Amino acid sequence: MIALIIGMLVSLIVTLVGTPLLIRLVHKLHYGQYIRQDGPQSHLVKRGTPTLGGVVINFAILLGWASSALYRYLRSGDVPSWSAALVLFAMLSMGLLGFIDDFAKVRKKQNEGLSVGGKFIGQFIFATIYAVLALLIPTKSGFPSAQAGISFIEQPFFNFDFAGRAVAIILFVIWVNFLMTAWTNAVNLTDGLDGLAAGSSMIAFTGFGIIAFWESYHIKGGSHGGYSYAVSDPLDLTVIAVCAAVACFGFLWYNSNPASIFMGDTGSLALGGLFAALSIATHTEFLAVVLGGLYVMEAMSDVIQVGYFKMTHKRVFKMAPIHHHFELEGWTETKVVVRFWMIELIFVLLALTIFYGDWVTRSGLLFS
Protein backbone atom coordinates (compact mmCIF):
# COMPACT_ATOMS: atom_id res chain seq x y z
CA MET A 1 0.00 0.00 0.00
CA ILE A 2 2.89 2.38 0.76
CA ALA A 3 4.34 1.69 -2.69
CA LEU A 4 0.99 2.57 -4.23
CA ILE A 5 0.78 5.84 -2.28
CA ILE A 6 4.33 6.77 -3.29
CA GLY A 7 3.50 6.21 -6.95
CA MET A 8 0.36 8.32 -6.66
CA LEU A 9 2.16 11.20 -4.94
CA VAL A 10 5.00 11.25 -7.47
CA SER A 11 2.58 11.20 -10.41
CA LEU A 12 0.57 14.05 -8.89
CA ILE A 13 3.65 16.17 -8.14
CA VAL A 14 5.07 15.64 -11.64
CA THR A 15 1.86 16.81 -13.31
CA LEU A 16 1.23 19.74 -10.97
CA VAL A 17 4.83 20.99 -11.25
CA GLY A 18 5.71 19.83 -14.75
CA THR A 19 2.63 21.08 -16.61
CA PRO A 20 3.13 24.83 -15.97
CA LEU A 21 6.79 24.43 -16.96
CA LEU A 22 5.73 22.80 -20.21
CA ILE A 23 3.15 25.55 -20.81
CA ARG A 24 5.90 28.18 -20.58
CA LEU A 25 8.17 26.20 -22.90
CA VAL A 26 5.46 25.65 -25.51
CA HIS A 27 4.51 29.34 -25.36
CA LYS A 28 8.14 30.26 -25.92
CA LEU A 29 8.36 27.94 -28.94
CA HIS A 30 4.97 29.14 -30.26
CA TYR A 31 3.69 25.56 -30.44
CA GLY A 32 -0.03 26.26 -30.23
CA GLN A 33 -2.98 24.05 -31.14
CA TYR A 34 -4.59 24.41 -34.56
CA ILE A 35 -8.41 24.51 -34.38
CA ARG A 36 -10.52 23.01 -37.18
CA GLN A 37 -12.54 25.61 -39.08
CA ASP A 38 -15.62 23.39 -39.46
CA GLY A 39 -15.99 22.82 -35.72
CA PRO A 40 -18.14 24.80 -33.27
CA GLN A 41 -17.39 28.51 -33.66
CA SER A 42 -16.93 28.83 -29.89
CA HIS A 43 -13.74 26.77 -30.22
CA LEU A 44 -11.96 29.26 -32.47
CA VAL A 45 -10.83 31.25 -29.42
CA LYS A 46 -8.76 28.22 -28.41
CA ARG A 47 -6.43 28.61 -31.39
CA GLY A 48 -2.86 28.90 -30.17
CA THR A 49 -3.48 27.17 -26.82
CA PRO A 50 -0.33 25.19 -25.91
CA THR A 51 -0.47 21.50 -26.75
CA LEU A 52 1.84 18.48 -26.14
CA GLY A 53 0.57 18.19 -22.55
CA GLY A 54 0.61 14.43 -22.94
CA VAL A 55 4.38 14.58 -22.50
CA VAL A 56 3.86 15.43 -18.83
CA ILE A 57 1.16 12.77 -18.41
CA ASN A 58 3.46 10.09 -19.84
CA PHE A 59 6.37 11.11 -17.63
CA ALA A 60 4.14 11.33 -14.56
CA ILE A 61 2.87 7.77 -15.04
CA LEU A 62 6.36 6.44 -15.80
CA LEU A 63 8.03 8.19 -12.85
CA GLY A 64 5.17 7.30 -10.50
CA TRP A 65 5.51 3.62 -11.35
CA ALA A 66 9.34 3.80 -11.20
CA SER A 67 9.33 5.36 -7.72
CA SER A 68 6.90 2.71 -6.51
CA ALA A 69 9.03 -0.05 -8.03
CA LEU A 70 12.18 1.42 -6.44
CA TYR A 71 10.55 1.45 -3.00
CA ARG A 72 9.47 -2.19 -3.36
CA TYR A 73 12.96 -3.18 -4.51
CA LEU A 74 14.71 -1.43 -1.62
CA ARG A 75 12.20 -2.79 0.89
CA SER A 76 11.92 -6.41 -0.22
CA GLY A 77 14.14 -6.94 -3.26
CA ASP A 78 11.10 -7.18 -5.52
CA VAL A 79 12.29 -6.49 -9.08
CA PRO A 80 10.05 -4.74 -11.64
CA SER A 81 7.81 -7.11 -13.57
CA TRP A 82 7.79 -7.89 -17.26
CA SER A 83 4.04 -7.27 -17.36
CA ALA A 84 4.51 -3.70 -16.14
CA ALA A 85 7.27 -3.08 -18.68
CA LEU A 86 5.03 -4.28 -21.52
CA VAL A 87 2.07 -2.15 -20.46
CA LEU A 88 4.33 0.90 -20.21
CA PHE A 89 5.81 0.06 -23.62
CA ALA A 90 2.32 0.12 -25.11
CA MET A 91 1.65 3.50 -23.52
CA LEU A 92 4.95 5.12 -24.47
CA SER A 93 5.07 3.75 -28.02
CA MET A 94 1.58 5.03 -28.80
CA GLY A 95 2.49 8.28 -27.07
CA LEU A 96 5.54 8.56 -29.34
CA LEU A 97 3.32 8.29 -32.41
CA GLY A 98 1.08 10.97 -30.93
CA PHE A 99 4.09 13.21 -30.25
CA ILE A 100 5.26 12.91 -33.86
CA ASP A 101 1.72 13.76 -35.00
CA ASP A 102 1.45 16.75 -32.63
CA PHE A 103 4.90 18.04 -33.52
CA ALA A 104 4.12 17.89 -37.24
CA LYS A 105 0.88 19.83 -36.67
CA VAL A 106 2.45 22.65 -34.70
CA ARG A 107 5.38 22.91 -37.10
CA LYS A 108 3.08 23.09 -40.14
CA LYS A 109 0.54 25.21 -38.20
CA GLN A 110 -2.33 23.14 -39.55
CA ASN A 111 -4.46 20.19 -38.47
CA GLU A 112 -2.57 17.68 -40.61
CA GLY A 113 0.20 15.82 -38.86
CA LEU A 114 1.26 12.24 -39.37
CA SER A 115 -0.48 10.68 -42.38
CA VAL A 116 -3.17 8.06 -41.82
CA GLY A 117 -0.92 5.46 -43.43
CA GLY A 118 2.08 6.47 -41.34
CA LYS A 119 0.06 6.33 -38.13
CA PHE A 120 -1.37 2.92 -39.06
CA ILE A 121 2.08 1.49 -39.84
CA GLY A 122 3.45 2.81 -36.55
CA GLN A 123 0.54 1.37 -34.56
CA PHE A 124 0.90 -1.96 -36.36
CA ILE A 125 4.62 -2.22 -35.61
CA PHE A 126 4.34 -1.30 -31.93
CA ALA A 127 1.19 -3.36 -31.31
CA THR A 128 2.76 -6.40 -32.97
CA ILE A 129 5.91 -6.10 -30.85
CA TYR A 130 3.77 -5.84 -27.72
CA ALA A 131 1.61 -8.84 -28.72
CA VAL A 132 4.52 -11.17 -29.49
CA LEU A 133 6.47 -10.28 -26.34
CA ALA A 134 3.38 -10.49 -24.10
CA LEU A 135 2.48 -13.93 -25.40
CA LEU A 136 5.88 -15.60 -25.67
CA ILE A 137 8.08 -14.31 -22.84
CA PRO A 138 7.37 -15.85 -19.41
CA THR A 139 7.00 -13.67 -16.31
CA LYS A 140 8.28 -14.08 -12.77
CA SER A 141 4.79 -14.97 -11.53
CA GLY A 142 4.56 -17.99 -13.80
CA PHE A 143 1.50 -16.62 -15.58
CA PRO A 144 1.76 -15.14 -19.09
CA SER A 145 1.40 -11.39 -19.56
CA ALA A 146 -1.37 -12.20 -22.02
CA GLN A 147 -3.41 -15.21 -23.03
CA ALA A 148 -4.06 -16.37 -26.58
CA GLY A 149 -7.77 -15.72 -26.51
CA ILE A 150 -10.56 -13.21 -25.96
CA SER A 151 -11.81 -12.72 -22.41
CA PHE A 152 -14.76 -11.03 -20.80
CA ILE A 153 -13.36 -11.53 -17.31
CA GLU A 154 -10.22 -13.65 -16.79
CA GLN A 155 -11.22 -16.89 -18.55
CA PRO A 156 -11.17 -16.71 -22.39
CA PHE A 157 -14.51 -17.47 -24.02
CA PHE A 158 -12.75 -17.85 -27.38
CA ASN A 159 -9.33 -19.49 -27.49
CA PHE A 160 -6.94 -18.92 -30.39
CA ASP A 161 -5.15 -22.24 -29.78
CA PHE A 162 -7.79 -24.24 -31.67
CA ALA A 163 -5.53 -24.58 -34.77
CA GLY A 164 -2.09 -24.77 -33.20
CA ARG A 165 0.38 -22.36 -31.64
CA ALA A 166 1.46 -20.61 -34.84
CA VAL A 167 -2.13 -19.75 -35.79
CA ALA A 168 -2.80 -18.65 -32.21
CA ILE A 169 0.08 -16.17 -32.33
CA ILE A 170 -1.09 -14.73 -35.66
CA LEU A 171 -4.69 -14.37 -34.47
CA PHE A 172 -3.53 -12.81 -31.20
CA VAL A 173 -1.40 -10.26 -33.07
CA ILE A 174 -4.45 -9.33 -35.18
CA TRP A 175 -6.61 -9.06 -32.04
CA VAL A 176 -4.09 -6.83 -30.24
CA ASN A 177 -3.76 -4.60 -33.30
CA PHE A 178 -7.52 -4.20 -33.37
CA LEU A 179 -7.65 -3.31 -29.66
CA MET A 180 -4.78 -0.83 -29.86
CA THR A 181 -6.22 0.89 -32.92
CA ALA A 182 -9.75 0.96 -31.52
CA TRP A 183 -8.89 2.32 -28.07
CA THR A 184 -6.30 4.87 -29.22
CA ASN A 185 -8.76 6.29 -31.76
CA ALA A 186 -11.62 6.22 -29.24
CA VAL A 187 -9.69 8.19 -26.61
CA ASN A 188 -8.40 10.53 -29.32
CA LEU A 189 -11.98 11.28 -30.43
CA THR A 190 -12.98 11.89 -26.80
CA ASP A 191 -10.28 14.55 -26.47
CA GLY A 192 -12.34 17.29 -28.09
CA LEU A 193 -13.44 19.46 -25.17
CA ASP A 194 -11.52 21.03 -22.29
CA GLY A 195 -11.04 18.40 -19.60
CA LEU A 196 -13.20 15.72 -21.24
CA ALA A 197 -10.52 13.13 -21.99
CA ALA A 198 -8.50 13.88 -18.84
CA GLY A 199 -11.50 13.65 -16.51
CA SER A 200 -13.05 10.58 -18.10
CA SER A 201 -9.65 8.85 -18.21
CA MET A 202 -9.15 9.62 -14.52
CA ILE A 203 -12.42 7.79 -13.81
CA ALA A 204 -11.71 4.91 -16.21
CA PHE A 205 -8.21 4.19 -14.91
CA THR A 206 -9.45 4.34 -11.33
CA GLY A 207 -11.80 1.52 -12.33
CA PHE A 208 -8.92 -0.45 -13.84
CA GLY A 209 -6.91 0.13 -10.67
CA ILE A 210 -9.70 -1.36 -8.54
CA ILE A 211 -9.98 -4.39 -10.84
CA ALA A 212 -6.23 -5.01 -10.87
CA PHE A 213 -6.01 -4.59 -7.09
CA TRP A 214 -8.80 -7.12 -6.56
CA GLU A 215 -6.99 -9.55 -8.87
CA SER A 216 -3.76 -9.07 -6.90
CA TYR A 217 -5.60 -9.69 -3.62
CA HIS A 218 -7.11 -12.88 -5.03
CA ILE A 219 -4.14 -14.02 -7.10
CA LYS A 220 -3.94 -17.74 -7.84
CA GLY A 221 -1.76 -19.43 -5.23
CA GLY A 222 -2.52 -16.75 -2.63
CA SER A 223 -3.97 -17.23 0.83
CA HIS A 224 -7.26 -15.40 0.41
CA GLY A 225 -10.49 -17.27 -0.15
CA GLY A 226 -12.84 -17.17 -3.08
CA TYR A 227 -12.14 -17.34 -6.78
CA SER A 228 -8.49 -16.64 -7.70
CA TYR A 229 -7.06 -15.09 -10.85
CA ALA A 230 -4.24 -16.39 -13.04
CA VAL A 231 -3.09 -12.88 -13.94
CA SER A 232 0.54 -11.88 -14.18
CA ASP A 233 1.77 -9.28 -11.66
CA PRO A 234 -1.56 -7.51 -11.04
CA LEU A 235 -0.11 -5.36 -8.24
CA ASP A 236 2.21 -3.68 -10.74
CA LEU A 237 -0.77 -3.17 -13.02
CA THR A 238 -2.62 -1.58 -10.10
CA VAL A 239 0.18 0.92 -9.56
CA ILE A 240 0.28 1.88 -13.25
CA ALA A 241 -3.50 2.28 -13.51
CA VAL A 242 -3.71 4.40 -10.36
CA CYS A 243 -0.71 6.52 -11.43
CA ALA A 244 -2.50 7.12 -14.74
CA ALA A 245 -5.66 8.20 -12.91
CA VAL A 246 -3.72 10.58 -10.65
CA ALA A 247 -1.69 11.97 -13.57
CA CYS A 248 -4.95 12.80 -15.37
CA PHE A 249 -6.28 14.36 -12.15
CA GLY A 250 -3.23 16.60 -11.84
CA PHE A 251 -3.30 17.52 -15.52
CA LEU A 252 -6.97 18.43 -15.21
CA TRP A 253 -5.98 21.38 -13.00
CA TYR A 254 -4.58 23.05 -16.14
CA ASN A 255 -6.81 21.36 -18.75
CA SER A 256 -10.21 22.28 -17.28
CA ASN A 257 -12.23 24.96 -19.05
CA PRO A 258 -10.78 27.29 -20.17
CA ALA A 259 -7.81 25.03 -20.83
CA SER A 260 -4.30 26.40 -20.39
CA ILE A 261 -2.90 23.39 -22.29
CA PHE A 262 -4.16 20.43 -24.32
CA MET A 263 -2.87 16.87 -23.95
CA GLY A 264 -2.78 16.46 -27.73
CA ASP A 265 -2.33 13.13 -29.49
CA THR A 266 0.74 12.61 -27.29
CA GLY A 267 -1.64 12.13 -24.39
CA SER A 268 -4.74 10.66 -26.00
CA LEU A 269 -2.92 7.96 -27.99
CA ALA A 270 -0.79 7.06 -24.96
CA LEU A 271 -3.84 6.75 -22.71
CA GLY A 272 -5.63 4.70 -25.37
CA GLY A 273 -2.65 2.37 -25.70
CA LEU A 274 -2.44 2.04 -21.92
CA PHE A 275 -6.17 1.29 -21.68
CA ALA A 276 -5.88 -1.43 -24.33
CA ALA A 277 -2.80 -2.97 -22.71
CA LEU A 278 -4.41 -3.02 -19.25
CA SER A 279 -7.48 -4.76 -20.65
CA ILE A 280 -5.21 -7.44 -22.14
CA ALA A 281 -3.01 -7.78 -19.05
CA THR A 282 -5.96 -8.06 -16.64
CA HIS A 283 -7.81 -10.41 -19.03
CA THR A 284 -10.82 -8.09 -19.26
CA GLU A 285 -10.88 -7.16 -22.94
CA PHE A 286 -14.67 -7.26 -23.25
CA LEU A 287 -15.40 -5.85 -19.79
CA ALA A 288 -13.28 -2.89 -20.88
CA VAL A 289 -16.00 -2.03 -23.40
CA VAL A 290 -18.24 -1.27 -20.41
CA LEU A 291 -15.45 0.27 -18.33
CA GLY A 292 -14.54 2.64 -21.17
CA GLY A 293 -18.14 3.12 -22.21
CA LEU A 294 -17.76 6.84 -22.85
CA TYR A 295 -14.88 6.20 -25.26
CA VAL A 296 -17.05 3.64 -27.06
CA MET A 297 -19.97 6.08 -27.22
CA GLU A 298 -17.77 8.79 -28.74
CA ALA A 299 -16.19 6.44 -31.29
CA MET A 300 -19.48 4.83 -32.30
CA SER A 301 -21.11 8.23 -32.83
CA ASP A 302 -18.36 9.01 -35.33
CA VAL A 303 -18.71 5.63 -37.07
CA ILE A 304 -22.50 5.98 -37.27
CA GLN A 305 -22.25 9.54 -38.59
CA VAL A 306 -19.78 8.64 -41.35
CA GLY A 307 -21.50 5.39 -42.31
CA TYR A 308 -24.99 6.87 -42.42
CA PHE A 309 -23.81 9.89 -44.41
CA LYS A 310 -22.14 7.67 -47.01
CA MET A 311 -25.34 5.65 -47.44
CA THR A 312 -27.93 8.46 -47.35
CA HIS A 313 -26.01 11.76 -47.62
CA LYS A 314 -27.77 12.75 -44.40
CA ARG A 315 -26.45 13.12 -40.86
CA VAL A 316 -27.66 11.46 -37.67
CA PHE A 317 -25.99 14.06 -35.43
CA LYS A 318 -25.46 17.76 -35.99
CA MET A 319 -21.76 17.01 -35.66
CA ALA A 320 -19.61 14.06 -34.60
CA PRO A 321 -18.16 12.99 -32.22
CA ILE A 322 -21.30 13.28 -30.16
CA HIS A 323 -19.97 15.86 -27.67
CA HIS A 324 -20.02 18.42 -30.50
CA HIS A 325 -23.65 17.51 -31.25
CA PHE A 326 -24.67 18.58 -27.76
CA GLU A 327 -22.64 21.79 -28.06
CA LEU A 328 -24.58 22.66 -31.22
CA GLU A 329 -27.79 21.80 -29.35
CA GLY A 330 -26.99 24.71 -27.03
CA TRP A 331 -25.25 23.01 -24.12
CA THR A 332 -22.26 24.89 -22.74
CA GLU A 333 -18.91 23.15 -23.04
CA THR A 334 -18.67 22.76 -19.26
CA LYS A 335 -22.13 21.19 -19.07
CA VAL A 336 -21.24 18.65 -21.77
CA VAL A 337 -17.97 17.75 -20.03
CA VAL A 338 -19.42 17.33 -16.54
CA ARG A 339 -22.37 15.29 -17.79
CA PHE A 340 -20.08 13.07 -19.85
CA TRP A 341 -17.91 12.54 -16.76
CA MET A 342 -21.05 11.42 -14.96
CA ILE A 343 -21.87 9.03 -17.81
CA GLU A 344 -18.36 7.55 -17.63
CA LEU A 345 -18.68 7.17 -13.85
CA ILE A 346 -21.90 5.20 -14.38
CA PHE A 347 -20.12 2.97 -16.91
CA VAL A 348 -17.26 2.32 -14.47
CA LEU A 349 -19.63 1.52 -11.59
CA LEU A 350 -21.53 -0.86 -13.89
CA ALA A 351 -18.27 -2.55 -14.93
CA LEU A 352 -17.16 -2.94 -11.31
CA THR A 353 -20.56 -4.38 -10.39
CA ILE A 354 -20.28 -6.92 -13.21
CA PHE A 355 -16.70 -7.76 -12.19
CA TYR A 356 -17.59 -8.27 -8.53
CA GLY A 357 -20.73 -10.21 -9.42
CA ASP A 358 -18.63 -12.53 -11.57
CA TRP A 359 -16.23 -13.10 -8.66
CA VAL A 360 -19.08 -13.83 -6.25
CA THR A 361 -20.63 -16.28 -8.70
CA ARG A 362 -17.36 -18.10 -9.42
CA SER A 363 -16.58 -18.22 -5.71
CA GLY A 364 -19.87 -20.02 -5.06
CA LEU A 365 -21.02 -17.27 -2.70
CA LEU A 366 -24.13 -16.22 -4.60
CA PHE A 367 -26.53 -18.52 -2.75
CA SER A 368 -24.41 -19.36 0.28
From Swiss-Prot:
The organism's place on the tree of life at top rank: Bacteria
Membrane topology designation: Multi-pass membrane protein
Single Gene Ontology MF annotation: phospho-N-acetylmuramoyl-pentapeptide-transferase activity
First-tier enzyme category under EC: transferase
A GO BP entry: regulation of cell shape
EC assignment: 2.7.8.13
Main subcellular location: membrane
GO cellular component, one term: plasma membrane
Record key words, sorted: Cell cycle, Cell division, Cell membrane, Cell shape, Cell wall biogenesis/degradation, Magnesium, Membrane, Metal-binding, Peptidoglycan synthesis, Transferase, Transmembrane, Transmembrane helix
Membrane-spanning intervals of the chain: 2-22, 51-71, 80-100, 117-137, 167-187, 193-213, 234-254, 271-291, 340-360
Cofactor: Mg(2+)
Pathway note: Cell wall biogenesis; peptidoglycan biosynthesis
Catalytic activity: UDP-N-acetyl-alpha-D-muramoyl-L-alanyl-gamma-D-glutamyl-meso-2,6-diaminopimeloyl-D-alanyl-D-alanine + di-trans,octa-cis-undecaprenyl phosphate = di-trans,octa-cis-undecaprenyl diphospho-N-acetyl-alpha-D-muramoyl-L-alanyl-D-glutamyl-meso-2,6-diaminopimeloyl-D-alanyl-D-alanine + UMP
InterPro entries with a match to the protein in the record: Glycosyl_transferase_4, PNAcMuramoyl-5peptid_Trfase, PNAcMuramoyl-5peptid_Trfase_CS
UniProt cross-references to PROSITE patterns, sorted A to Z: MRAY_2
Subcellular location, record wording: Cell membrane
Function: Catalyzes the initial step of the lipid cycle reactions in the biosynthesis of the cell wall peptidoglycan: transfers peptidoglycan precursor phospho-MurNAc-pentapeptide from UDP-MurNAc-pentapeptide onto the lipid carrier undecaprenyl phosphate, yielding undecaprenyl-pyrophosphoryl-MurNAc-pentapeptide, known as lipid I.
Record HAMAP family: MraY
Family membership: Belongs to the glycosyltransferase 4 family. MraY subfamily.
UniProt-recorded name of the protein: Phospho-N-acetylmuramoyl-pentapeptide-transferase
Lineage, opening ranks: Bacteria, Bacillati, Actinomycetota, Actinomycetes, Bifidobacteriales
